[in-house]
Each structure stands twice: as structure tokens, then as C-alpha cells.
Amino acid sequence: PIKHSLSPIIHNAALTALNLNWCYLALPCETANLGLVLESLRKINCKGLNITIPHKQEVINYCKAVEPIAKNIGAVNTLIPAKDNYWNGTNTDIQGFLAPLKKCESLAGKDGVVLGSGGSARAVVHGLNSLNLSHITIISRNRNSLEKLLNLIELTKSTSTTYLSLIEGDSSIKEYIRDSSLIVNTTPVGMLNKSKKKESMAIPLGKEYW
């Protein structure tokens, strides 16, 4: 997914505007090489890292310390240099996700759908719980990651007004989307024009899609 990222354009423009002699690069990394890449970047005095899918959960294992907000959702998307060539981890996904939503009408008492159950989904569900939605339905193809997400939410006691389920088949997905006011896609679907699921994931008129 790193190939689709607009982060280099955004951050390099900001660095130029601030007259900082830094650069922001997108670096492909296989999971098997994650530890080696992180160690190498720290040794060359890299000033910080953003972590994207599929590494947001695995990267926790390489952090010297993890901030509470990242611990609560079990995912890290930002690494900050620490002493002795270590990294500290945090998560800014929640703030980034909620910022535009707070400019919209209140979602309190309404239903929402989250597509996916990985690291980004963890942050999204955590953020949605602060908006007092009536129900949140999580739709995932990966039962293992979904069960881990449900266990995490249960441990953080954030399920008092949340309905969570694994839905099989496009027809069921469309039913939940139809009855919800907010749809959040945390999956790779839609990142590439050649996505095979593009047509089947068409969003009904009047729905908010993030």
C-alpha cells in the first residue's frame, strides 16, 4: 500500500515551507525485514517514521516505549527517536480521523459501519466510541484479526453502545451500509483503480464515506 501514499508530497511541501533541510520518503518494507529496517533507520539518525498497513501492530514489538493511546488500540503509526538507538511509538490515527468528523453534524445515536479489522480499524473504532454512536458494525474478511479487535475492545470496556459482527457476503454488507449513517473504509479496497471490489462496494446515495 505504500505506493499509493500521498504523504511524501504533503510532508515535503510542509518541510519546504518551514525551511527545514529534511526529506520525507516512502520506503517499502516486507514484514520479515521490519526489525532490520527500523534498526538501520535509527542508526542513521532518522528523525521519525510513519507506519502504515500492514505493520501497525507488529511494529509495537520494536518499540522501547508505547504511549497509552497506542497501547489502548494496539496499533502504532508514528515512531519517535529514543535513546540508545531505540524507538518510542504513538498513534495519531484517532485525531486525524476525528478532526473532519467533528465539523459535521452530530453522529450521536446513529449507526456506523467500519470495513476492516486491522490497525487502522482499531483507531477508528476507538474514535467512534467517543462520538456516542448507537451501534458500530465491523465487517471483516479476516476472522482472526476481527477476534483480536473484539477482545481488545472488550478489555478497554468500550462496548457499552457498540454492536460488532462479522458479515459474510456482499448482500449482508449492503444491508448494514443501507441502515448506517457513516461508512469508514480501513481496507486496501479502492486504493488502486484495478480493485476487483470497486463496483460491489458502491455506496448508496446520501451516505457519508470516509
Predicted regions and their residues:
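Conserved acidic residues
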Residues: 28-30, 142, 166-170
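Short acidic/polar active-site loop segments enriched in Thr and Asp
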Residues: 47, 110, 134, 159
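Receiver (REC) domain switch-region micro-motif
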Residues: 49, 112, 183-184
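Glycine-rich adenosine-cofactor-binding loop
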Residues: 91, 101, 105-133, 140-143
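Rossmann-like adenosine-cofactor binding region
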Residues: 161-210
